[in-house]
Each structure stands twice: as structure tokens, then as C-alpha cells.
């Protein structure tokens, strides 16, 4: 019985620190230093939320650039079911999925080069990836240009404008945020 009091007081102290002080402190610091990121990096047009800069969307129309496939459950890019497909490289089901995606992309992009960029046929680990390489976006230019009646040069400039360089050149590669790129495409039509 003599050991119960120190154990209980330690438990209550740690509960207060880890369950109260630490979460409140990190939330307050996040809201103070990074308010846009702490609130979901929401992309707004006026009072309307159009998406998040961190979560991809399922763009399927010919007039939009398509992102990486989503492996989330129930619906594509479901943030409540984030996760990869968990299919090993040796799994025949993964081969079938990739072959089907390649065939669909080639059918939708008949004027594109024959080699389909790998990120357009493989899902990311989170299933929510919103970025592709500028090369993968450029591969889709003929389809988008035809659907929107825009020039290849206009779309090339738009991809260059929305390309983001890595913080350190030798770590990572340039990427294009598909949500922001497609919203910019919609603004061109206005």
C-alpha cells in the first residue's frame, strides 16, 4: 500500500503533462508559427474551400492533369482511410493493377510518348499524394491542351510556374501540386 501513492501521483503527473500540457502547447505553437499548415493547408477561393495543398483529389476529366492513383479504401483520396495498397512488388495483383493503369493512360493520352511516367501508375504510400514530377505533368499536356483548346506552350509555362523545387537540391526532386495546377487551369477559362 505504501507504493501506491507514489505510483498514483506519478501517473497523474504524467497524465497532466502528456494529456494536457504537451498537446495544448504544441497546438498553440503550431497555430502561432504555422497557422496555414496547422489548419490543413486549405486552398480557398473567397469563402469556398476548394481543396487542401496536402491531399490529392481524383481528377478524371480529360481537361485536367491527373495525379497518382490512390489506394485508399471506399473512394479515391479518402483522408480517413489513408494507406498504401500494401502489395509487394512480387505480387501478381500489383502487376495487373499497373498494366490496367498503363492501358487506361495510353488510351486517354494517345498523343503522349509511349513510356508512361511511373508515378502515374503506382500509388503512394499514403494513398493521398498530391504531387507528381513536372515530367509526368508534361506527359499529359497533349490531352489537356486538346480538351481545353490551349496551346502546348501555355500548359508548359503553367507547369513551370507551379513546379516546386526541393529545399535542398540533392534531396528530392521538383514536383507539381496537381490540385493547385488544376485550379490554375480553371482560372485560365474564366
Swiss-Prot record:
One of its GO terms (cellular component) is plasma membrane. It comes from the Bacteria. InterPro entries: KdpC (IPR003820). It is found in: Cell inner membrane. Keywords: ATP-binding, Cell inner membrane, Cell membrane, Ion transport, Membrane, Nucleotide-binding, Potassium, Potassium transport, Transmembrane, Transmembrane helix, Transport. One of its GO terms (molecular function) is P-type potassium transmembrane transporter activity. The chain crosses the membrane at residues 10-30. It is a single-pass membrane protein. Its main location: membrane. Belongs to the KdpC family. The system is composed of three essential subunits: KdpA, KdpB and KdpC. Part of the high-affinity ATP-driven potassium transport (or Kdp) system, which catalyzes the hydrolysis of ATP coupled with the electrogenic transport of potassium into the cytoplasm. This subunit acts as a catalytic chaperone that increases the ATP-binding affinity of the ATP-hydrolyzing subunit KdpB by the formation of a transient KdpB/KdpC/ATP ternary complex. This is Potassium-transporting ATPase KdpC subunit. The gene is kdpC.
